[in-house]
């Protein structure tokens, strides 16, 4: 069982997850021409919070995650809410090719968990239809205190470094904008702030 499997059932109890998703959804709506003809993919969809917020703005969303626990929660949400344009899928793009194209690929707080950033950007590019869009929300470079010790993740990202990787993959019109800030307290009850960017690019 992965760590995400073990926390799937309680994930939505943290209000930050909903607040962050709302901020990202609002920024995506402002920065991208979302419409009901779009077929979208959320990669690393977790419990589907962001996809549910965007479900009325898009035609169809494939909610993909490699955690069985997270996908089970998404399936229950879709059934309980009778949402017909959301499809939960358990799949890992880092390991296998997914033979479908999309008008929009988006994710939040997923990129720092992916080892080979250049490879996943190329995968996203190849999965986009001509003129399609990419939207990625993640941490700016941080000192490692966001996740703490013994977690194998990237410590946030320098936007300029990501720009180079995106252009190398074939993307154009790469833009970054701060969209949310996470506030956390350390062991000494001191507050620390972690800004999150929204990256957008087009094929």
Predicted regions span which residues?
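Conserved class I S-adenosyl-L-methionine
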Residues: 1-35, 50, 73, 135-161
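A conserved beta-strand element that flanks and buttresses the S-adenosyl-L-methionine
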Residues: 106
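Short catalytic micro-motifs in class I SAM-dependent methyltransferases
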Residues: 109-113
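Short alpha-helix
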Residues: 155-170, 176
